[in-house]
Structure formats: structure tokens, C-alpha cells
């Protein structure tokens, strides 16, 4: 026997690999048809309903269809990874960035999925597009009992980029320098 899945999956082969572990089946026993409907933007990066449908179908021995209305979809789908972070940024009087220190913590929810990769990618890009001769970055992905988090548009960059861009605005204000000039000088 085997199982056949139709789902709006972004990576059907990864889904097959994960479902084979969940169901203790050979990957050859699982066929996944990915619907090419709509944009991804992270919502189809992790498996959502596939494990629930697969287990139900396998146990019941018949076809199962899971459908979420709009409200259920918002409740069930992954949420953006919340970051808590502290930044220290040094610049000289002319606006040259000298150092950037980041300590970041990401609430990746109760179990692994793509959320740890999302957090790691955000931390890896904590300096944005700017040149800092000295950097110190520390990040920890923390498992909690909060909502399941995952991939969203920006893939972890938005959270720390918001902090960095806000930091640069504060530096420009303190130096009485144009915000765009500060950024252009440090690309």
C-alpha cells in the first residue's frame, strides 16, 4: 500500500521525505501532487495539513479531505518568528560606521520546521547591506509553547533589518546628519 497527497506544497519531495518518517513508509510509497496555485511567500514552505491528512487517511484506509476556511487558515497557519534583540552600533563624528553588536533571540515555537532556518538567516544578515569593520553577533533560537512559527515574506530579514534601520535613523539624528547620506556612506 501507499498514500497519495494533493497539497499546495512548495517542496513536494521534502514533504515526501518527512511523511515517510511520520508514517514509517518508504518514500516510494508516497506520491505528492503540488498544486501550482497562488504565491508562496513562505506559507507553503513548511508542511501544514499534509501530516494530518496523511495519518487520517492511513489509519482510516480511505480518502480524506481537509479544507480550512479563511478564519481557520489564519489560526492554523504558521506565524512570523518573533525576535527579541539588543543592538549597539558605533559611528564616528563623520558618520562612518565602526562597529555593530547584536544579541538576538527568536521564538521558534514548539517544534522544528523551517523556523530555525528563518531565524538563522535573519541573524546571518543582521548587518543588512552596510559595512561594519567590527561586528559581534550572537543569536539563539528558543523553543517555546507559543504558536508555531515559520517562513514569511522576507525570511527572517525583516525583524533585524527593522532594528538596524531604526538604529541608523537614531545615529543620523544624533549626528545631525541626513539619514540617506549616512546609509549611502556605509554601503
Where is each model-derived feature located?
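Structural alpha/beta core scaffold segments of enzyme domains
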Residues: 1-187
Amino acid at each position: 500500500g501507499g498514500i497519495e497527497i494533493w497539497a499546495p506544497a512548495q517542496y513536494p519531495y521534502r514533504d515526501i521525505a518527512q511523511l515517510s518518517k511520520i508514517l514509517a513508509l518508504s518514500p516510494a510509497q508516497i506520491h505528492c501532487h503540488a498544486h501550482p496555485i497562488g504565491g508562496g511567500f513562505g506559507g507553503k514552505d513548511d508542511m501544514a495539513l499534509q501530516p494530518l491528512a496523511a495519518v487520517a487517511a492511513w489509519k482510516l484506509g480511505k480518502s480524506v479531505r481537509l479544507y480550512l476556511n479563511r478564519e481557520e487558515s489564519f489560526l492554523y497557519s504558521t506565524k512570523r518568528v518573533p525576535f527579541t534583540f539588543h543592538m549597539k552600533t558605533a559611528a564616528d563624528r563623520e558618520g562612518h560606521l565602526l562597529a555593530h553588536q547584536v544579541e538576538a533571540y527568536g521564538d521558534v515555537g514548539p517544534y522544528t520546521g523551517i523556523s530555525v532556518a528563518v531565524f538563522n538567516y535573519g541573524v546571518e544578515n543582521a548587518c543588512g547591506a552596510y559595512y561594519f569593520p567590527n561586528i559581534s553577533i550572537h543569536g539563539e533560537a528558543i523553543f517555546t509553547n507559543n504558536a508555531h512559527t515559520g517562513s514569511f515574506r522576507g525570511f527572517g530579514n525583516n525583524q533585524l533589518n527593522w532594528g538596524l534601520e531604526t538604529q541608523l535613523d537614531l545615529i543620523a539624528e544624533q549626528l545631525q546628519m541626513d539619514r540617506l547620506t549616512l546609509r549611502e556612506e556605509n554601503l
